[in-house]
Amino acid sequence: MKHYKVYQIDSFTRTKLRGNPAGVVSNANGLNEAQMQQIARELNNSETAFIFTPEKSADYDVEVRFFTPTAEVPICGHATIAAHYVRAIQGTHTQGRALQKTKAGILAIDTLRQNGDFAIQMTQATPKIKPPLDKNVVSKITRALGISESDLREDCHVCEASTGHGKVMIGIKDLHLLHSLTPNMSALASISAQIQCNGFYVFTLDENDEFLAHGRMFAPAIGINEDPVTGNANGPLGAYLVYYGICKGLQNGDEFSFFIKQGEAIGREGQMQVRVSIKNGKPALVQIIGEAVVAFETEIVL
């Protein structure tokens, strides 16, 4: 029998019970895949992170695996923030860079000191932007969201963007409409099976607001009807905006940095900063920065 330390972390916020909750098991060595899936199902967060200490000869500092209540996923933004926030408050890694092994590759994570607490910067995987989706598929998506195609922004192609875990980018014109969406989740799940992409990120843009983007992310195909605040949607959003030259006036030379807000419609408001490094006019590197707070901690004996 072993005692496993379990944290409930609210990511992308400093306020408990806001932002995006993630489970973190900080000493996961010894757990098998079935046990990790059972723990993730028991905690019932959108994702739970399992932290493994590697062998000393490894070319990375820490391994983290991510499970939804129903399946393992390659990477998760808010659970990465949560996992490294736990490592910081435990004193394992309190400042500077660590290399994190994931199913999406080895990624750089930076622990920062901000206002007497910690913030976590996640360098995401190489951005990839796929071609716009077929018009028939776009029509299915808008019907599933309960909107018309005239609600879509003309400058925003509906396509998949990824920095490790792809999302369909759907830019719409109106913030009130965004907050009032009530999607047909079974229809979205069917579309996911068709296009082999599990997440739909609906967003608005306002270049004159403190928060450039507001968004909502739906992923019913993997058991997440709505994710409150999504690192692996907003990082790809930054790459997508650079790729298509949207909000180009806000770019500062070879860098594009902005803040987003998400989760307002479901009472889990959170925010993050997105940074995109630009090379030859295209997104080359994407980073997100988020805060976190401990909601509670406990242990499980297995």
Which residue stretches match the model-derived regions?
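Gly/Ser/Thr-rich beta-alpha loop segments that engage phosphate groups in nucleotides
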Residues: 21, 25, 79, 166, ...
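Conserved phosphate-donor
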Residues: 45-63, 187-223, 257-279
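Short glycine/threonine-rich catalytic loop with a Thr-x-Gly-x-Asp
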Residues: 73-76, 224-238
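Short glycine/proline-enriched turns and hinge-like loops at secondary-structure junctions
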Residues: 17-20, 76-77, 112, 211-212, ...
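Short hydrophobic alpha-helical segments that form membrane-spanning helices or hydrophobic packing faces
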Residues: 23-27, 84-85, 171, 237-239
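Acidic/His- and Gly-rich active-site-bordering loop/insert found
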Residues: 22, 26-36, 40-62, 66-68, ...
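N-terminal, positively charged, Ser/Thr/Ala/Gly-biased leader segments
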Residues: 1-18, 147-150
